[in-house]
UniProtKB/Swiss-Prot annotation:
It comes from Caenorhabditis elegans. GO terms for molecular function: guanyl-nucleotide exchange factor activity; ubiquitin protein ligase activity. RCC1 repeats lie at residues 737-787, 788-838, 839-891, 893-943, 1034-1085, 1087-1139. This is X-linked retinitis pigmentosa GTPase regulator homolog. SUPFAM superfamilies: RCC1/BLIP-II. Could be a guanine-nucleotide releasing factor for glo-1. May play a role in gut granule biogenesis. Regulates axon termination in PLM and ALM neurons.
Length: 1386
């Protein structure tokens, strides 16, 4: 069926199948506007109407258009049409303005449609002018409304060659319908319809004309049998049929509509019309909605204002709400509803279609039908249904007939799959699958099996969005497709890695059930990384994600080689270590090593600084025992070369250790690696003097734990590294929860077994990162900083406080790598961390919900990796982290704070909840030199030794409020007591002062000074939960604050408002102090460590035994709270260490023990001298970067560029580490030029020892003087310009002998003073000439009996008293050279 709203187009009803349409939810509706898809071609041509934007976002329209009838002349047009159809038959008659009839017939027996054109005047031999057409009953005849108001009945055989048509309709007949009361010009028919009456059965025709007359014509009697009069000219009549009634839906030219009964309840039309009064007929409402007839007695209503279509099952249901509503594009004026789709026509004559397959929703996804024409449609005719095809339509327009059918390039199953993909998640179920399959008349099982492959095949060449992946996964669940099978379907299309998010979600819901998918996750991450095609940022992102996954599933151990090939080095290291542990084999380790050896250049060049550290660490930690000699030598060479690009000493130390470990198997390569690593360490050692070492922090206390750096450089920890504490319990809730667990799980859930007390005693934490320098504790985690500046983390990590890129617990100390300057100081809050770098920058990470990370704006997200704090004007010199706030000290002596201010942490009395950026503490002109915080309150020490604190423990504030409320209640009770004294004589009642705060008082939360009488300057300060401590320059320890847990060390529970000295042990000189929740840890100058306070988790490092009279079961006391009955354990005194107690077997390292570390320089020099020349040459090559076309960062050049010498301002390390040992290596290796360049930079380095430089310089001059193979003009010029000379060297003959070779070099002359030039001239002796036998001239023998023969030049001359010792010939030659070279400079 079709319906439209129009006042200027003729139309007839078209027969079609019944409407059972519902709709699917529209995902996109971008074409519901006035924008046209493209430029129009000339009128009448077929063109493409599909926008690029629509094709990209919406489902591809499955329909295409083709012309079927377009045989009219230019001045002819279609004015009316009629249709007759059933399941295998379709007949369409088109009436033209010239009286021609175009017939179009399709049957199931015909291979192609039959067409015919007949002129009515010619065929009937009558002078008639047909204006309407209607196909009669059983398609046996056709009825034409004539311009004069009469009807023409012709047999169908007259219009097209068919075999049917009864004898009753064998002749052409004109039925006279002339009405004497109607003007002839108004008698012209506007609509003609045919139906078969029920009472009695009779073939009838209905004719409407311009005068508003409705004529019922008995076609057997050939006459009008009834006449009705409408109040206006009629435009359209639709016939509404059901088993017991026939009604007319009449539409006037104004759009007003009425329903006129013809037959009802078994009564014929004569009886019904007799009782029908036209004035009683009611106009259908609303006026904005146009109603049309549909098949099966249905009615369809189009509301162009709201752009909706309402479908009613029968015309009797118009008064009820049983309807289905569909959204249509704006400006729609014609719609055709089929079983599975809707077609719409807009005012611009654009044809759109939307599939619904029986699903109802308020929106559909409409797309343009390709290659539709721009002729104005008159109506839409449904095609007969065909197997495996969507139902098509014919569009009747002013020029003829256009076929719209499913494209042959598309498969119905794929079309249905795409539609099913666009259903809402709530509609995705097995019933929906069956509904779509039945609507398409395909097998449900076949459709279900092809659903996912069809969707993936059309998307295999692009990246699926998260929404698409989620929808496909929902479909898989609807058809009961397992994740394994779904993954196979994805892999068949080579897009398996795109399912990764859904696979991860599936595993997370039930890891045990989906264990078989976990290894596939590794494979998918590898494929993702390989598909990144060198995008290292993406690969690192995938590496981090997979690392998070592996942290949760520690049993996975396969795939390390694939991860290495994909460039995911963090996961490679994790999987290799696990594989060795699981399989007890190192084959995987060897395979990874061989891959790195083979692809070393590509791997290193593609890696950034962080990746390089990871790769080097991986190579050093892999097992080399199965490497061949050649491969072992290559690995050593790789590590030797890679160290040029690494500046962290811990990695050089790592290479040195691996060289020592494998020296027996690979002696020569490991010797080279050892020397290279040692030289790098020496260079860093030269730079990292005591002034540049990280801040020394050997002692740390956490929530219920402690940690220290021992005197033998081990890490010792004790206590419980969790946030556990004694909590109040509610018996009713606990019992209820246990019952709930028993019901749901079948057995009560038992709490995890408590750790044994012995497990809380001091224990070693393995630390492979070199020599630890500083340690800090949070509630659940530890940070460790080595002397070389390498940061490591261990422990709880649920907020990212370990800074390793994920939020899972770190089972072993894990290096925190990143691109930041050298770290100098570290600090841990309860769940966040921070460190300060050498450039004064601040980096924070971990819990950030209160703004305690200080990143400004409204940034309260957790940071999983260290992130720099921007916006700080001054350099940061100290850092302290509390529970939810952070305090820093700048180089100007100012204190900055950020984070939570609920309990005064911001240093003001105002109620400040959160501060996201660092703000100054209101201290005025006072300069601060030390800060401390760990929980809620903070302390700062000014330069004049004053102590200020701010903030309060919330438990303390709540207790204060509790007392105040009790006082208020007592006062109120006293004022209301009847037994109170009688009113005063003046009638007024005495009032009690009730001026008590209703909320937490804040006047004591801000900055306040702590008065003290200390015996020296404060050198250290620390904060706990409710207590504080400091150490003076005299080694005296003072504590103050709450003492309920004996945390003050005074042997009692008294609270101290100002610092009080800790007297035990006697004579102790305190060096370090750190505070935990309710315990204190401190160390003395002899390395002893003491602890006292709360010890329920062994945080004091010892076991405390219960008193003899204590019951085995801890006693509890109950109290009635507002939200129910609660109880708390009655803690006995055995859970405390009441006075400072020594922690056995723990001795802390003190600062004075932090001497020189690393390799010994003299030892390295001796090893170099004893090494083979080839070894030293190999070491030399590994120390410098072989960059072609560069002068390696030196000012030495063969020739000046553009007449000027190019000079770099800073050494870039291309000749190797900047130290004298590097220059010595180059010198021994014979690379004198490089050694001289190194000396050039060493002269400008303030950390270079002058004595070592002069010794090195003398060696250079010695080599230059004694080895002619290095005496090139370039090398000599460089040496005279840059190598220092002592006075003795300058006056010596060796240097004077070399100078003449370069004395005409302007650069050499400009670098020497006149005195230096004269000194070398004075020390000059002519070069010796090798003479085996001197020749004596005969003239010399004749003149004198004595001659002098010069061995240096073999000249002979008479000996004379007072003659100079030099050869006169050579002297003249030398003088001439000097004069020629120096001119008048002397």
């Amino acid at each position: 069926m079709f319906f439209k709203r129009s006042t200027n187009s003729r139309k007839t009803s078209a027969n079609s199948s019944s409407d059972t349409s519902t709709s699917s939810e529209s995902l996109l509706l971008p074409l519901l506007n006035n924008t046209k898809a493209g430029a129009r071609s000339q009128k009448g041509s077929v063109h493409r109407q599909s926008g690029k934007k629509a094709r990209r976002k919406m489902m591809e329209n499955p329909y295409v258009c083709s012309l079927e009838l377009d045989e009219l002349s230019a001045d002819d047009s279609i004015i009316d049409y009629s249709v007759f159809s059933d399941d295998s038959f379709l007949l369409i008659l088109l009436l033209t303005s010239k009286g021609d009839v175009q017939a179009y017939l399709e049957t199931s027996r015909d291979t192609k449609p039959r067409k015919n054109v007949v002129n009515i005047k010619t065929a009937c031999s009558l002078n008639v002018s047909p204006v309407t057409v209607c196909i009669g009953s059983q398609a046996a005849f056709a009825i034409f409304g004539l311009a004069d108001g009469n009807l023409l009945v012709t047999p169908i055989r007259l219009l097209i060659d068919v075999t049917w048509g009864g004898s009753s309709w064998a002749t052409t007949t004109v039925i006279d319908l002339s009405l004497p009361t109607v003007d002839p010009c108004l008698a012209t028919p506007t609509c003609t319809k045919c139906f078969v009456s029920n009472f009695p059965p009779c073939t009838m025709a209905v004719v409407a004309n311009k005068a508003g007359n409705i004529l019922l014509v008995d076609l057997h009697l050939r006459k009008c049998v009834s006449e009705l009069k409408a109040p206006q000219s009629l435009h359209q009549i639709d016939i509404l049929l059901d088993e017991n009634s026939i009604e007319l839906l009449v539409t006037g030219f104004t759009g007003a509509q009425w329903i006129i009964p013809i037959e009802r309840s078994g009564k014929g039309f004569r009886e019904v019309l007799t009782t029908c009064v036209p004035s009683d007929l009611t106009v259908l409402e609303p006026a904005t909605m146009q109603f049309f007839a549909a098949d099966s007695c249905g009615v369809v209503a189009l509301d162009t204002t709201e752009s909706i279509v309402e479908v009613y099952n029968t015309f009797h249901s118009l008064a009820h709400s049983s309807k289905r509503t569909f959204k249509v594009p704006p400006e729609t004026w014609m719609v055709h509803a089929g079983d599975n789709m809707l077609f719409t026509v807009s005012n611009d004559n654009e044809i759109r279609s939307a599939l619904h397959f029986g699903f109802m929703s308020s929106r559909l996804e409409y797309t343009l039908v390709r290659t539709s024409t721009n002729w104005r449609p008159l109506g839409i005719v449904a095609m007969p249904s065909r197997p495996h095809k969507l139902a098509g339509i014919f569009v009747v327009n002013e020029r003829g007939l256009v076929r719209v059918e499913q494209s042959t390039a598309l498969n119905l199953t794929k079309i249905a799959s795409e539609f099913f993909f666009r259903l809402s998640p709530l509609q995705l179920n097995s019933k929906s699958v069956a509904q779509v399959a039945n609507a398409c008349r395909i097998d449900t099982a076949e459709f279900q099996s092809a659903l996912i492959p069809n969707l993936l095949s059309t998307r295999k060449n692009r990246q699926l969005t998260n929404k698409e992946l989620s929808q496909i996964y929902s479909i898989a669940k609807a058809i009961n497709l397992s994740m394994s099978d779904l993954l196979k379907a994805f892999e068949n299309e080579s897009i398996g890695e795109q399912l990764l998010p859904e696979v991860l979600n599936t595993i997370q819901t039930n890891p045990a059930k989906h264990d078989n998918l976990m290894q596939r996750v590794v494979e998918m991450f590898v494929k993702r990384s390989l598909s990144a095609e060198g995008n290292m940022d993406k690969i690192r992102e995938y590496d981090a994600e997979l690392s998070n996954f592996l942290a949760r599933h520690e049993h996975l151990h396969k795939g390390s080689v694939d991860c290495a090939k994909a460039g995911m080095w963090k996961c490679t290291q994790t999987l290799v270590r696990r594989d060795v542990h699981e399989t007890k084999s190192i084959d995987t380790s060897t395979e990874v090593l061989l891959y790195i050896i083979k692809n070393r250049l590509q791997i290193w060049n593609e890696a950034n600084s962080t990746d390089r550290l990871q790769i080097m660490s991986l190579v050093c930690h892999l097992d080399w025992s199965k490497l061949a000699d050649a491969d072992g030598a290559r690995v050593c060479a790789i590590l030797s070369a890679w160290q040029r690009d690494i500046s962290l000493p811990s990695y050089h130390e790592m290479c040195l250790r691996i060289a020592i470990t494998n020296s027996d198997r690979f002696p020569r390569p490991c010797q080279i690696l050892s020397l290279v690593s040692s030289i790098h360490i020496l260079s860093e050692k030269k730079i990292s003097n005591h002034a540049n070492l990280p801040n020394f922090l050997p002692l740390a206390g956490g929530n219920n734990c402690g940690a220290t750096i021992t005197e033998d450089d081990r890490l010792m920890i004790w206590g419980n590294f969790t946030n556990a504490q004694q909590r109040m319990e509610m018996p009713q809730m606990n019992a209820k929860s246990k019952r709930s667990d028993s019901v749901t799980n079948g057995a009560p859930t038992l709490p995890p077994p408590a750790p044994k007390p012995e497990q809380h005693l001091p224990r070693v934490l393995e630390y492979p990162g070199g020599r630890p320098r500083a340690i800090a504790c949070g509630a659940e985690h530890i940070l460790v900083l080595s002397s070389s500046g390498q940061l490591s983390a261990w422990g709880g990590n649920r907020f990212g406080q370990c800074g390793v890129g994920h939020s899972f617990r770190i089972a072993n100390l894990h290096q925190v790598d990143g691109d930041w300057p050298a770290i100098e100081k570290i600090a841990c809050g309860q769940f966040h961390s921070a460190f300060i770098c050498s450039d004064g920058s601040l980096w924070t990470f971990g819990w950030g919900v209160w703004g305690q990370l200080g990143h400004g704006g409204r940034n309260n997200s957790n940071q999983l990796v260290p992130t720099r704090v921007n916006g700080l004007i001054c350099k940061v010199t100290q850092i302290a982290c509390g529970r939810a706030h952070t305090v820093v000290l700048t180089d100007t002596g100012r204190v900055l704070v950020c984070g939570s201010g609920s309990y005064g942490q911001m240093g003001v009395d105002d109620d400040i909840k959160k501060v996201f950026a660092f703000t100054p503490l209101p201290l005025g002109p006072l300069r601060v030199r030390d800060i401390a915080t760990h929980y809620y309150h903070s302390i700062c020490i000014t330069e004049d030794n004053r102590v200020f604190e701010w903030g309060r423990n919330p438990q303390e504030l709540k207790m204060r409020m509790f007392v105040m409320k009790k006082i208020r209640s007592a006062q109120l009770k006293n004022t209301e007591d009847p037994s109170s004294p009688s009113p005063s004589t003046n009638g007024s009642t005495p009032r009690v002062n009730l001026n008590l705060p209703a909320e937490i008082p804040r006047e004591d939360l801000g900055l306040r000074e702590v008065k003290h009488f200390l015996d020296g300057n404060i050198v250290s300060v620390a904060c706990g939960l409710s207590h504080s401590a400091l150490i003076t320059s005299e080694g005296t320890l003072y504590t103050w604050g709450k003492g309920l847990d004996y945390q003050l060390g005074h042997g009692n529970k008294n609270e101290r408002m100002e610092p009080h000295q800790v007297f035990e042990p006697n004579g102790a000189k305190w060096v370090n102090v750190s505070l935990g929740n309710n315990h204190t840890i401190a160390s003395t100058d002899d390395g002893s460590v003491f602890a006292w306070g709360k010890n329920d988790f062994g945080q004091c490092g010892v076991l405390t035994k219960k008193n003899g009279n204590s019951a085995d079961v801890t006693k509890k006391f109950f109290f009635q709270a507002r939200d129910g009955r609660r109880f708390m354990p009655n803690v006995d005194e055995s859970q405390f260490v009441q006075k400072p107690g020594l922690i056995p077997d723990v001795r802390v390292r003190n600062l004075n023990e932090d001497g020189n570390e690393g390799v010994d320089k003299e030892e390295i020099v001796d090893r170099l001298k004893a090494s083979d020349v080839n070894v030293v040459q190999a070491v030399s090559k590994h120390l410098y970067s072989p960059i072609e076309g560069k002068c390696n960062g030196s000012i030495i050049e063969d020739e000046p560029r553009n007449g000027k010498i190019q000079k770099q301002n800073k050494y870039d390390g291309e000749d190797g580490p900047l130290c004298t040992t590097t220059a010595l290596v180059h010198l021994i290796a014979g690379d004198v030029k490089r050694a001289i360049r190194m000396i050039e930079w060493l002269k400008t380095d303030s950390s270079t020892c002058e004595k070592s430089l002069m010794v090195l310089s003398s060696l250079v001059w010695e080599v230059m003087a004694n080895h002619e193979d290095v005496q090139s003009r370039e090398a000599l010029s460089a040496a005279f310009r840059h190598v220092p000379m002592s006075d003795s060297m300058r006056k010596g003959k060796q240097i004077a002998q070399l100078w003449p070779a370069v004395w005409n070099d302007e650069r050499v002359q400009s670098s020497l003073s006149i005195d230096e030039k004269i000194a070398m001239l004075d020390g000059f002796t002519s070069a010796s000439k090798p003479v085996s036998c001197p020749t004596i001239p005969s003239s010399s023998l004749e003149v004198s009996s004595k001659i002098r023969v010069y061995a240096q030049c073999a000249h002979a001359e008479p000996a004379a008293v007072g003659s100079p010792p030099e050869c006169s010939t050579c002297l003249d030659e030398w003088t001439e050279k000097v004069r020629h070279t120096l001119g008048t400079q002397l």
